[in-house]
Curated annotation (Swiss-Prot):
The keyword Thylakoid does not apply. The gene is proQ. Disulfide bonds: none annotated. HAMAP family: ProQ (MF_00749). It comes from Shewanella baltica (strain OS223). Its main location: cytoplasm. Residues 105-148 are annotated as: Disordered. It holds the Pfam family ProQ_C. This is RNA chaperone ProQ. It comes from the Bacteria.
Length: 209
């Protein structure tokens, strides 16, 4: 009897996608940009698969498309691919610029984190001074200038009546809002194409202006 146990760990779901769609999801080495709207294709292809849920698939797909390995592949001349690895058109410059900005931001954060965790070198002992008639004045080291605070972006909760097609918005996904464009509004369901190429369906309460 086939096991119906659901996969809940994101790494396990990614491993399942690598195995099931090896021409689309690349486990090692250089990846390929994914087709816009691939999540819908993935959900339909796995609709009868009891191992994964749409929620977990969305989390795994977001982890895959926000990795450094994936963001580096979003570059000029690269072709998007579908679940079977078939070409689906070249990348738009807007998506390339957004991916490179996300990559730089992520790398800068990682660099700052490594610097904060690095052990500080031990202070060297100053050599003994030769006695002089007058006491030598020691200059106090200048205090470092305070770091400028990061700009605070004040988002506004969107109302359904405020939203229109082709409007740029921010979608609440995790800790950081993700930018995208509204592609369709169906009653209370708003379809948003994120700048990473992923298309999702959310309610107005998840959209920020």
């Amino acid at each position: 009897m086939e096991s119906t146990e659901k996969l809940t760990d994101t790494n396990a779901i990614l491993a399942y996608l690598y195995e099931t769609f090896p021409l689309c999801f690349i486990a090692e080495g250089e990846t390929k940009p994914l087709k816009i709207g691939l999540f819908q294709d993935l959900a339909e292809r796995l609709a009868d698969d009891s191992k994964v849920s749409k929620t977990q698939l969305r989390v795994a797909l977001r982890r895959y498309t926000s990795s450094w390995r994936y963001l580096k592949c979003v570059k000029a001349g690269a072709q998007r691919v579908n679940l079977d690895g078939e070409p689906c058109g070249e990348l738009e410059q807007e998506h390339i610029d957004h991916a490179q900005a996300m990559l730089k931001e992520s790398q800068d954060k990682a660099k700052a984190k490594r610097a904060a965790l690095a052990p500080k070198p031990a202070a060297k002992k100053a050599p003994k001074k030769v006695a002089v008639p007058q006491r030598a004045k020691t200059e106090r080291p200048a205090k470092p200038a305070p770091k400028a605070a990061a700009p605070v972006v004040n988002y506004v909760q969107a109302q359904l009546t405020d939203l229109t097609k082709k409007q740029r918005v921010n979608v609440k996904l995790g800790m950081t809002p993700v930018a995208g464009v509204i592609t369709d509004i169906n009653k209370e369901d708003i379809h948003v194409q994120l700048d990473s190429g992923l298309t999702i369906k959310v309610r107005a309460e998840h959209i920020l202006l």
